[in-house]
C-alpha cells in the first residue's frame, strides 16, 4: 500500500501544484487507499491476537511472556526499506489488543526485556552479556550451539522466558526440545 500511496500522492500533488494550489489536500482515492491499509492492519492484528488467545485457552496457559521492545526504533538505521517497515508496525496496538483479550480470559501478559536473548545458548546458566556470543548466529534464522542447531527466534523466545522466571525468583528447568523446529501457525492469507 505504501508504494501506491506514494504514487497517488506524487500524481495528485503535481496536478494540484500545476493548478496553483499551494497546500493540496489528499485525493478521495488516496484516502480510500489509506483507509484500506489501516483496515487490513487492524484486521490482521485482531486475527493474530485471537489466535494467541485461542492457543493459550486450548493449552491451559495462564501467563504469556512477551518481549518488551520499547525504543527498538530509536537510533537505528537498518536501510531505507527496513526502516519504513519497522516504523510502520504498530507495537503499542499489538500489546494493547493482546492485553485486553488475554485479560478477558483471565490470562496475564508479562513484558520482559530482550537483551542478549538471541545471542545466549539455551544451555547457558544465565541469559547475560557474559554468556552472549554473536558468532553463534551464523546463518539467518539459525542458532548454532556446540552440538545442536536451533531456530534463532525459538532460542530468543526460550531465553526471554528464562529471564522472566529468573526475575520472578522461579528458577525452573525448562526442556529445550522443539527449539529446532517451532510450530508455525498461519493466521491470515
What are these regions (language model features)?
Residues 1-189:
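Positively charged, helix-rich recognition surfaces that bind polyanionic ligands
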